[in-house]
């Protein structure tokens, strides 16, 4: 189920994004990016609609994923 990120308190959203970024351990290429930069990138993707915030009832977890990969 998609969670409308706009309805979350700003601190809650930032904490969810930060947790996601730290969990993912994504390789950003030759140049290391700060946590703040990674959080800003994910937030931009949520704002543009490229990514969605998803609640998994099965696992009782929140995740962020590309919108085109989301299936209900």
Swiss-Prot record:
Matches recorded under InterPro entries: UPF0270, YehU-like_sf
Top-level taxonomic group: Bacteria
Chain coiled-coil ranges: none
One Pfam family this sequence matches: UPF0270
Family assignment from sequence similarity: Belongs to the UPF0270 family.
HAMAP family, sorted: UPF0270 (MF_00690)
Identification of the protein by name: UPF0270 protein YheU
Biological classification of the source: Bacteria, Pseudomonadati, Pseudomonadota, Gammaproteobacteria, Enterobacterales
Gene field: yheU
């Amino acid at each position: 189920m998609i969670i409308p990120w706009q309805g979350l308190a700003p601190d809650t959203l930032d904490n969810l994004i930060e947790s996601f970024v730290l969990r993912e351990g994504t390789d950003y290429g030759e140049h290391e990016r700060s946590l703040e930069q990674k959080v800003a990138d994910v937030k931009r993707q949520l704002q543009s609609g490229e990514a969605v915030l998803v609640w998994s009832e099965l696992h009782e977890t929140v995740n962020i994923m590309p919108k085109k990969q989301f299936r209900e």
